[in-house]
């Protein structure tokens, strides 16, 4: 049973979620939460994201990580900051030798809810149902858990077909 880390990156709040892939199409909740960076300088916030993700990896020991791709925001500055936070999380995962896969928000919603047009509340409710949670996780943590679930489902559909792991392709799997 593989431990999977899901990351919902943000320059102020980065959600994380860890699930155990049962290998039978299901996942078991392990942990979730948010890395909050406050309102400091961007380089300080990126350092907090990097250190926070690295600490989570060292604490729980996941072997693979799914992370959300950057979407095109109306505000270019916000998209750039989001991309930088993503980069900090990816470097933390790479330094800990995790295989890393990237997913669009639409792919995650499709995998968890069944439609790429789902809203955050629908994703949150399906995450609660799939992981048998008794209370609502924070939205950013819920999104990260959804990314981890998406990664578990994608891995299980790819790996049996002889496509290998992301590691065999240089550490990053783009889907």
Curated annotation (Swiss-Prot):
Annotated catalysed reactions: Endonucleolytic cleavage at a junction such as a reciprocal single-stranded crossover between two homologous DNA duplexes (Holliday junction)
GO biological process: DNA recombination; DNA repair
Pfam families: RuvC
Keywords attached to this entry: Cytoplasm, DNA damage, DNA recombination, DNA repair, DNA-binding, Endonuclease, Hydrolase, Magnesium, Metal-binding, Nuclease
Gene3D superfamilies: Ribonuclease H-like superfamily/Ribonuclease H (3.30.420.10)
Enzyme Commission no: 3.1.21.10
Binding of Mg(2+) 1, residues: 8, 140
Names of required cofactors: Mg(2+)
Primary enzyme class: hydrolase
Domain of life of the source: Bacteria
Reported function: The RuvA-RuvB-RuvC complex processes Holliday junction (HJ) DNA during genetic recombination and DNA repair. Endonuclease that resolves HJ intermediates. Cleaves cruciform DNA by making single-stranded nicks across the HJ at symmetrical positions within the homologous arms, yielding a 5'-phosphate and a 3'-hydroxyl group; requires a central core of homology in the junction. The consensus cleavage sequence is 5'-(A/T)TT(C/G)-3'. Cleavage occurs on the 3'-side of the TT dinucleotide at the point of strand exchange.
Name this polypeptide is given: Crossover junction endodeoxyribonuclease RuvC
Lineage, opening ranks: Bacteria, Pseudomonadati, Pseudomonadota, Gammaproteobacteria, Pseudomonadales
Gene this protein is translated from: ruvC
